[in-house]
């Protein structure tokens, strides 16, 4: 599975000096390749899905192709995931020659290649020196996170076991954060864990809200395989982004321009928009009162767990008071028209004519989890 979207892929390797055949019993696909294949065949792979790499010290053919049976991508390949094979280092095909094959150490004012033994010895000596001189907590680790195609810190099992399991290092930063903390700490404080929805939600939604994300380009398979069917089922789309991206155009093509609302907010005003929407929706009474009553404090005061886990908001009314922002204030801060904010609120929460609640699926990223707004 590739990246956080989780698209399925099949990986095949076989020796460079071994060939299959066109008959069904002589190839991995089990298909008669001597016959014309249909346009949507899953037995074809693009040049970007092929390479020659080293495996167990030997050259092998490598094919990484989309899994047509995976419910996430249904055989679709994005511009990133469909190039996993091409993005492997290969001395035979010449791909990714800039990838390191040995450690680098900063010596004499420049990065220089060194042996694994030298690199491991250096790390061990520096780490031991810090511990002997002071304390384990004086050791700071800076790293990039995530696994994905090229491997990541979480995949370097030995390193993780050393620093987190054995030494229990407390001080760590990763590629997009000053600490190894949550990207969505505020929503967790409100009882909403991230990644808590199914992709099927997009196909069932009355409204799809996209905040600081450009899914056609950045979550291609999720957009094409799940969001587009939702639009074809009648979903309206709200896009919160200072820019007009290709996603906005694609949504207008699929859902109709009249069913797409692009809120081109001023950069860094995401929370002001959400507070305004919250204030307006709550003021209209478009809330699930039973859910709110069962999920919030009713008169009691929230207590902090510790310094790292501050107290959550108390009652729903307290949240309304703390986050209150009028349409006029929100429009002035975000640069949006009041009418567009009202339209967004209606698309998100206004009950249908029969009184049933609207189903809104919200995907958010830049400006909220990767911003300091």
What label would you give each PLM region?
Residues 122, 238, 245-355:
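Long, well-ordered, tryptophan-enriched scaffold segments
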Residues 1-284:
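N-terminal export/assembly segments and adjacent metallocofactor-ligating motifs
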Residues 140-151, 329-336, 364-372:
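Conserved short loop/turn motifs at secondary-structure junctions
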Residues 142, 344, 348-373:
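A glycine-rich, hydrophobic/aromatic-adjacent loop/helix-cap motif
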Residues 20-22, 171-172, 286-290, 340-342, ...:
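Acidic/polar loop patches that form or flank catalytic/metal-binding clefts of enzymes
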């Amino acid at each position: 599975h590739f990246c956080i979207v989780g698209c399925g892929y099949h990986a095949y390797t076989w020796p460079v000096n071994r060939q299959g055949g066109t008959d069904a019993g002589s190839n991995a696909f089990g298909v008669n390749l001597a016959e014309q294949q249909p346009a949507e065949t899953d037995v074809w792979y693009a040049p970007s899905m092929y390479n020659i790499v080293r495996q167990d010290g030997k050259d092998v053919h490598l094919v990484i192709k989309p899994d047509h049976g995976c419910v996430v991508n249904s055989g679709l390949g994005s511009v990133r995931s469909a190039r996993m094979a091409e993005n492997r280092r290969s001395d035979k095909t010449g791909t990714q020659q800039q990838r390191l094959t040995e450690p680098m150490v900063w010596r004499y004012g420049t990065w220089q290649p060194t042996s694994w033994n030298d690199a491991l010895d250096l790390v061990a000596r520096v780490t031991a020196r810090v511990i002997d001189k002071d304390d384990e907590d004086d050791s700071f680790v800076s790293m990039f996170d995530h696994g994905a195609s090229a491997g990541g810190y979480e995949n370097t099992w030995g390193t993780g076991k050393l620093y987190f399991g054995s030494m229990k290092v407390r001080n760590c930063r990763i590629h997009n954060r000053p600490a190894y903390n949550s990207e969505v700490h505020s929503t967790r404080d409100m009882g909403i864990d991230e990644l808590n929805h199914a992709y099927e939600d997009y196909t069932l939604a009355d409204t799809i809200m996209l905040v600081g994300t450009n899914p056609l380009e950045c979550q291609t398979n999720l957009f094409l395989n799940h969001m587009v069917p939702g639009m074809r089922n009648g979903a309206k789309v709200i896009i919160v982004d200072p820019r007009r991206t290709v996603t906005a155009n694609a949504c207008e093509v699929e859902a109709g321009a009249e069913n797409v609302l692009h809120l081109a907010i001023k950069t860094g005003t995401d929370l002001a928009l959400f507070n305004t929407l919250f204030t307006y929706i709550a003021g209209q009474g478009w809330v699930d009162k039973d859910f709110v009553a069962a999920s919030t404090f009713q008169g009691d005061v929230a207590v902090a767990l510790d310094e790292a886990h501050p107290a959550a908001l108390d009652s729903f009314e307290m949240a309304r008071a703390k986050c209150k922002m009028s349409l006029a204030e929100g429009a002035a801060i975000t640069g949006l028209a009041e009418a567009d904010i009202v339209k967004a609120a209606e698309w998100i929460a206004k009950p249908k004519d029969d009184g049933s609640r609207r189903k809104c699926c919200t995907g958010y990223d830049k400006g909220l989890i990767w911003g300091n707004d």
